[in-house]
């Protein structure tokens, strides 16, 4: 557990006003992002069968919450970590065409999360996925889509200002693009997360590209990424510099998804070739899955950003250690 406590924190809104702002942001943003990216809202599972291989393995070390059910003896059911692979499967199952996509309200439990101002064991995000052509699996496509997502986030600043002018946090006017290798070359002495802090403070908002593969200097990845959804050469995180806490705030991870070649190479690099026998992976390697781009946009993180909140627990209901709750109460941080 770690906690940043800002000096003289003013939440600006009461808890009930905050709840109204959360409702407004969530309802407005999902409509706006759906229109911008041509996405249809779809119902999504909260749990999947382990045997399908559809759950997100995240960094490969976090264990999902799992259980068994009476009518499926011998099958382990897992609470989702995210819907990264399920969405691609759903696009195929429901017959989505080129440049059509879906978004879901995804709720997950990540029981092994390290808790801090931004991280909770409860995860809520808009998970989205869109069909693209194979020839569109390019950096240009990725950057254009990142700019579309940023445009909607920036527009939300104005929407929130109109309704809650006393609370809105002002965002930069543009997003910049950097690579993880470029950051390592510039600051080899810093850790990857320290590099993100540096570049976010310098530029205001950045898309940090190419996450998952080993960097040239250190021989270590910038950050962990599962090998079976993002193409590590065509992905990244949208990160804002967040003045209230004097640190970076990641709002979205997204990327162009693996094709057959990238899946095979990344499974080998991750020493996870056994996954190739799972139904999802088998279909993808056989060329039976659509080519897609997709990502997740944190709902609580976005509310926190737009309202200038000091803790994610001010915009979502979760469980926190007593020590954290006491420190927040002293600092006027109103946990729900």
UniProtKB/Swiss-Prot annotation:
<keyword id="KW-0436">Ligase</keyword>
<dbReference type="GO" id="GO:0005524">
    <property type="term" value="F:ATP binding"/>
</dbReference>
<protein>
    <recommendedName>
        <fullName>Aspartate--ammonia ligase</fullName>
        <ecNumber>6.3.1.1</ecNumber>
    </recommendedName>
</protein>
<comment type="pathway">
    <text>Amino-acid biosynthesis; L-asparagine biosynthesis; L-asparagine from L-aspartate (ammonia route): step 1/1.</text>
</comment>
<dbReference type="Pfam" id="PF03590">
    <property type="entry name" value="AsnA"/>
</dbReference>
<keyword id="KW-0061">Asparagine biosynthesis</keyword>
<keyword id="KW-0547">Nucleotide-binding</keyword>
<dbReference type="InterPro" id="IPR006195">
    <property type="entry name" value="aa-tRNA-synth_II"/>
</dbReference>
<dbReference type="InterPro" id="IPR004618">
    <property type="entry name" value="AsnA"/>
</dbReference>
<keyword id="KW-0067">ATP-binding</keyword>
<keyword id="KW-0028">Amino-acid biosynthesis</keyword>
<dbReference type="GO" id="GO:0140096">
    <property type="term" value="F:catalytic activity, acting on a protein"/>
</dbReference>
<keyword id="KW-0963">Cytoplasm</keyword>
<comment type="similarity">
    <text>Belongs to the class-II aminoacyl-tRNA synthetase family. AsnA subfamily.</text>
</comment>
<dbReference type="GO" id="GO:0016740">
    <property type="term" value="F:transferase activity"/>
</dbReference>
<dbReference type="GO" id="GO:0005829">
    <property type="term" value="C:cytosol"/>
</dbReference>
<dbReference type="InterPro" id="IPR045864">
    <property type="entry name" value="aa-tRNA-synth_II/BPL/LPL"/>
</dbReference>
<dbReference type="GO" id="GO:0070981">
    <property type="term" value="P:L-asparagine biosynthetic process"/>
</dbReference>
<dbReference type="GO" id="GO:0004071">
    <property type="term" value="F:aspartate-ammonia ligase activity"/>
</dbReference>
């Amino acid at each position: 557990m770690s906690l940043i406590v800002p000096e003289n924190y003013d939440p600006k809104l009461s808890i009930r006003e905050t709840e109204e702002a959360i409702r407004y942001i969530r309802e407005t943003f999902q409509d706006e992002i759906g229109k911008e990216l041509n996405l249809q809202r779809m119902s999504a599972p909260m749990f999947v069968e382990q045997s399908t291989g559809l759950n997100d393995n995240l960094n490969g070390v976090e264990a999902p919450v799992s259980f068994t059910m009476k009518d499926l003896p011998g099958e382990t059911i897992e609470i989702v970590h995210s819907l990264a692979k399920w969405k691609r499967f759903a696009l195929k199952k429901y017959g989505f065409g080129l440049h059509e996509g879906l978004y879901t309200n995804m709720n997950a439990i990540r029981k092994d999360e390290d808790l801090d101002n931004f991280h909770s064991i409860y995860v809520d995000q808009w998970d989205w996925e869109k069909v693209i052509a194979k020839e569109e699996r390019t950096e240009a496509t990725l950057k254009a889509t990142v700019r579309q997502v940023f445009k909607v986030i920036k527009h939300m600043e104005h929407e929130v200002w109109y309704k809650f002018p006393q609370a809105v946090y002002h965002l930069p006017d543009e997003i910049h693009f950097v690579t993880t290798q470029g950051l390592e070359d510039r600051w080899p002495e810093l850790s990857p997360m320290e590099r993100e802090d540096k570049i976010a403070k310098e530029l205001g908002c950045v898309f940090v590209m190419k996450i998952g593969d080993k960097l040239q200097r250190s021989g270590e990845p910038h950050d962990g990424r599962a090998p079976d959804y993002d193409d590590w050469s065509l992905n990244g995180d949208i990160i804002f510099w967040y003045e209230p806490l004097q640190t970076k705030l990641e709002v979205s991870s997204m990327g162009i998804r693996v094709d057959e070649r990238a899946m095979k190479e990344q499974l080998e690099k991750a020493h996870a070739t056994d996954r190739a026998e799972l139904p999802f992976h088998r279909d993808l390697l056989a060329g039976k899955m659509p080519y897609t781009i997709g990502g997740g946009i944190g709902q609580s993180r976005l509310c926190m950003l737009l309202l200038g909140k000091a803790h994610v627990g001010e915009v979502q209901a979760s469980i926190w250690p007593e020590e954290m709750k006491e420190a927040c109460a002293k600092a006027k941080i109103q946990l729900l």
